[in-house]
């Protein structure tokens, strides 16, 4: 199961006593600020969590899997995430949840 923005808002409502509206707005503002920074070409560093970076990928040759036809894959900018050491350690040492 995935963690959603709605669940984050609910958690803030429960734990911090924020109104549901304020909790939702806080979550939205947090992600909007990350989006804004990345759109402006900035790296996003979240201490104890990880870094969001931008990476430019060059054009490269590719192949259409259905037809086998050679096609170029266009150059593009992608967002990458590199988890920090604290996050890596916590995930590595966490006990798996029953599914």
Curated annotation (Swiss-Prot):
Disulfide bonds: none annotated. InterPro entries: Hist_DNA-bd, Histone-like_DNA-bd_CS, IHF-like_DNA-bd_dom_sf, IHF_alpha. GO terms for cellular component: cytosol. Keywords: DNA recombination, DNA-binding, Transcription, Transcription regulation, Translation regulation. The keyword Cell membrane does not apply. It holds the Pfam family Bac_DNA_binding. Residues 49-75 are annotated as: Disordered. Belongs to the bacterial histone-like protein family. PANTHER family: DNA-BINDING PROTEIN HU, INTEGRATION HOST FACTOR SUBUNIT ALPHA. Heterodimer of an alpha and a beta chain. This protein is one of the two subunits of integration host factor, a specific DNA-binding protein that functions in genetic recombination as well as in transcriptional and translational control. This is Integration host factor subunit alpha. It comes from Klebsiella pneumoniae subsp. pneumoniae (strain ATCC 700721 / MGH 78578). The gene is ihfA.
